[in-house]
Design a protein with these regions (language model features):
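N-terminal leader/targeting pre-sequences
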Residues: 1-257
Length: 259
């Protein structure tokens, strides 16, 4: 597996308001990102992300659509320590005879993984490829409260934090396959499964409300729409394989840690 450094690795929101939280004495700051498609990867989806941050507590909401469906998992991360921008189409390189952008190509732009937006359990960079604990399907509606590191909080405050949703359908056949070859992150995965699909840099927002439904107040996450359910995954070690029936590939279950 090609090593990648890990830190220390928008649809308009509905008008319904959710009042700023009052469960801490530390002021809350709202950050918002418009998630735009990585067009070099033949993506047409869009989305929005919002974070309310108080100290190291982050109430995170992501809404997206136009992604690969059929239960395909979409890893989502807050990237840090880069330039705080998303890759341009001109940065595409040749991958298996096709012009596209993979994770490594864009790392200088959005940086390394700081937080993995898993639906449960561990949310550190160790869970970067924990495919059974990421949202799945063509649309995502994600909400979770997490504790982020000092470095992730600092990157949000400095405008260097970027949200990236991964997983593309470059050849338009509705599933992940090897049209772009193997992923540079894990040779057992197709590149389509890990290449960036949507990207957006976080900026301080003037909004003082969360999307309709709001962020939850516990550690768990909510996600609506089609997707993979943890009941489909057999328990086991970090090497346990998750058969997803997409393009004949089995996606590796990584870094599964529950709290």
């Amino acid at each position: 597996m090609t090593a990648i450094a890990v830190a220390a690795v928008p649809l308009a929101f509905p008008a319904a308001a959710w009042a700023a939280p009052t469960d801490t004495d530390v002021p809350w700051t709202t950050y918002q990102a418009s998630l735009d498609p990585i067009t070099a990867n033949h993506v047409t989806g869009s989305g929005t992300a919002m974070i309310q941050l108080s100290g190291n507590t982050a109430k995170i909401t992501v809404t997206a659509s136009g992604l690969v469906g059929g239960g395909s998992p979409h890893a989502m991360h807050i990237h840090v320590d880069g330039a705080g921008v998303c890759p341009k189409p001109s940065e595409a390189k040749d991958h298996n005879g096709h012009s596209s952008i993979n994770v490594a190509d864009a790392m200088k732009d959005y940086g390394m993984i700081g937080t993995s937006l898993t639906t449960s359990g561990d949310s550190t960079p160790k869970s970067a490829l924990a495919v059974d604990r990421f949202p799945a399907g063509s649309s995502v509606k994600y909400s979770r409260t997490l504790e982020v590191t000092d470095n992730v909080a600092a990157n949000l405050k400095s405008g260097k934090a970027v949200l990236v949703v991964h997983g593309i359908d470059y050849n338009g056949n509705g599933k992940y396959d090897n049209v772009l070859g193997a992923s540079e992150l894990d040779k057992t995965l197709p590149a389509e499964a890990t290449d960036p699909a949507l990207c957006g840099a976080f900026n301080v927002s003037q909004m003082t409300s969360m999307p309709g439904g709001g962020a939850d107040t516990g550690d768990g996450a909510t996600q609506t729409g089609s997707g993979i359910h943890t009941g489909m995954v057999a328990g086991g070690s970090a090497a346990a394989m998750v058969g997803l029936g997409i393009g004949g590939f089995a996606l590796r279950r990584r870094g599964v840690t529950t709290r």
